Amino acid sequence: MTEKFDKSLLKKSFGSFATGVCVATSHSGGFTVNSFASLSLDPPLMIFNIYKTETDHVSFLNLNCFAINFLASNQKDISNIFASKDTDKLSKVDHYKTDNNIAVLNNTLGHLELSVFQQIDIAD
């Protein structure tokens, strides 16, 4: 994804993200992320960890794009759904599909649709 972006808007977005919890979603599933961080503004790069024990771990390894959904402090129920071992998490939350067929959760603080830049296999 090579769309132009506003660095100041991206910086403001990261600055207002206080909960530290978000949900990564694909076309068919997702999981709770509590390690999401901005790595670079130019180029825009983000970083997060996926545990190998995560239900959707293998499917995320083969993705070209996905979404990060920023949760509000009152959305613990959504965080818990995506932290579970349930194999049909998306059916339990309101969402829509983007033009790239990526599920985006409704009523969150916001979302980013991202493409994979690099994957590093380190540990569990």
Which role fits each region the language model picked out?
Residues 1-124:
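Active-site-proximal mixed secondary-structure blocks
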